[in-house]
A protein has these predicted regions:
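Serine-hydrolase catalytic machinery in alpha/beta-hydrolase-like enzymes
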Residues: 1-60, 155-159
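Short alpha-helix in the alpha/beta-hydrolase fold that links the catalytic acid
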Residues: 4, 124-134
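Short beta-to-alpha linker loops that shape the active-site pocket of alpha/beta-hydrolase fold enzymes
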Residues: 20-24, 97, 150
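Generic structural signal for well-ordered alpha-helices
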Residues: 45-52, 128, 132, 176
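Primarily recognizes the serine-hydrolase "nucleophile elbow" in alpha/beta-hydrolase
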Residues: 48-109
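Short beta-strand/loop motif that positions the catalytic acidic residue
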Residues: 108, 114-116
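Acidic catalytic loop of the alpha/beta-hydrolase fold
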Residues: 119-123
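C-terminal catalytic histidine-bearing segment of alpha/beta-hydrolase fold enzymes
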Residues: 136-183
Length: 183
């Protein structure tokens, strides 16, 4: 996540990566899964809303709006943040689950680019289709892209077994274009 924040900063965006695990860090996928399952989602959502509020109050973001992106659980949290925080003007979740209830997407104030892996037990076709239906129903500008031949975490270049460079580069280009156009 630090790498993604650094990439965004290198592109000229103010970037903030809140520490939702309060100092607990791991590079092991199994341990990361355990941390994720133990995370208090209500508290995490509140912390993200505070972080977005902090960024929105900074002079270097004044009047521009805030973007949100995240991966896996963070993708779901980014979507939820966009539903709950009107200062979010663009959101780009990667293989995230949907907010609950799904009709919260009616509150989203900007366009959505959602990137998904073709083969993903976490955020599979039912998740993608539900999000597309809800965004369409509520008249929200969106693009939902499924990357053929990819698996969950295809953007993560530290996990060579699932990383797919072409898909990751395409998705990143779409995130940057979304943010440049809307923030």
């Amino acid at each position: 996540i630090k790498d993604v924040a650094t990439r965004l900063a290198a592109e000229g965006f103010a970037a903030l990566a809140p520490d939702l695990y309060h100092g607990k860090v791991t590079k092991e996928p199994d341990e990361a899964g355990k941390l994720m399952m133990a995370l208090d989602m209500t508290r995490a959502s509140k912390e993200l809303a505070k972080a977005a509020g902090y960024l929105a109050a900074q002079p270097y973001t004044a009047g521009r709006g805030i973007g949100a992106t995240g991966f896996c659980m963070g993708g779901g949290l980014a979507l939820t943040l966009a539903c709950d925080s009107p200062q979010i003007k663009a959101v780009a979740p990667f293989y995230g689950v949907n907010p609950s209830p799904i009709d919260k997407v009616a509150n989203i104030q900007g366009p959505v680019f959602a990137a998904y892996a073709e083969h993903d037990a976490w955020a599979g076709p039912a998740v993608r289709e539900e999000l597309a239906r809800a965004l369409t129903q509520h008249g929200k500008q969106h693009e939902i892209k499924v990357y053929p031949g990819t698996e969950h975490a295809f953007f993560n270049d530290t996990r060579r077994e699932v990383y797919r460079e072409a898909a990751a580069k395409d998705a990143w280009g779409k995130v940057l274009a979304l943010f440049r156009e809307n923030l």
